[in-house]
Regions:
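Short, solvent-exposed, Trp/other aromatic-anchored flexible loops in extracytoplasmic proteins
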Residues: 116-159
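Short solvent-exposed strand-capping/beta-turn motif centered on an Asx-Ser/Thr pair
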Residues: 93-99, 113
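Membrane engagement elements in two modes
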Residues: 17-87, 97-101, 105, 147-151, ...
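Positively charged n-region of N-terminal signal peptides that target proteins for export
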Residues: 1-4
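C-terminal motif of bacterial Sec signal peptides marking the signal peptidase cleavage site
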Residues: 12-15
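Conserved aromatic beta-strand anchor motif in extracellular beta-sandwich/beta-rich domains
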Residues: 108-112
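Short structured motifs
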Residues: 73-80, 91, 124-129
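Intrinsic-disorder/low-complexity, polar/charged segments enriched in Ser/Thr/Lys/Arg/Asp/Glu/Gln
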Residues: 85-89, 138-140
Length: 173
């Protein structure tokens, strides 16, 4: 339950940071914008198509319930609040007009309450293992955590103390 609360709070805070001010006018403007954008879809690698798991269901649910994830023209990454077999489940969002059909590399920085989980960690997203990431889709990536990182991630309770960013995104030939 705690993790579900963290997930919802993260998504709400992320959504709030995109708005100019709180109130009824923002809500109707946001609904209009979301309706005009392409629909965000959750995808899995071909080897997982037709299969189900708690993580796949979580990815589908978050994508359906939070179409505001990411920003138009950009890629983004979010922590789902889930950890499975010592691996953190992060959601990669592609809201660009480009279908990702080649392997990607990017740097990930992630901290909580001033304590580093990853510092410019090079992450590889391989098409062979993870599948293509078409325009306006989301997918999950699982990052292995050592025991110290796992303890820190498990202790997270205040989303406002977390920072997570990706940089240096590039296609790999």
């Amino acid at each position: 339950m705690k993790k579900l609360f963290v997930i919802i709070l993260l998504l709400v805070l992320g959504a709030c940071s995109n708005g100019k001010e709180a109130g009824g006018t923002e809500k109707s403007t946001r609904e209009t914008v979301v309706n005009k954008e392409k629909e965000l879809k959750f995808v899995v690698a071909p080897q997982y198509e037709g299969k189900t798991s708690d993580l796949i269901e979580l990815g589908k649910k978050l994508t359906k319930e939070h179409p505001e994830l990411g920003s138009k023209g950009n890629m983004a990454i979010y922590f789902t609040g889930a950890v499975s077999d010592g691996r953190a489940a992060l959601m990669l969002v592609n809201k660009t007009d480009v279908d990702i059909k080649k392997d990607l590399e990017f740097s990930l920085s992630w901290s909580y309450d001033g304590k580093t989980i990853f510092d410019n960690q090079k992450i590889s997203y391989t098409i062979k293992d993870s599948g293509e990431l078409p325009s306006y889709t989301t997918t999950l990536i699982l990052l292995p955590l050592n025991s110290e990182q796992l303890d820190l991630v498990d202790s997270m309770s205040d989303p406002s103390k977390m920072t997570l960013s990706m940089s240096d995104v590039k296609s790999v030939e």
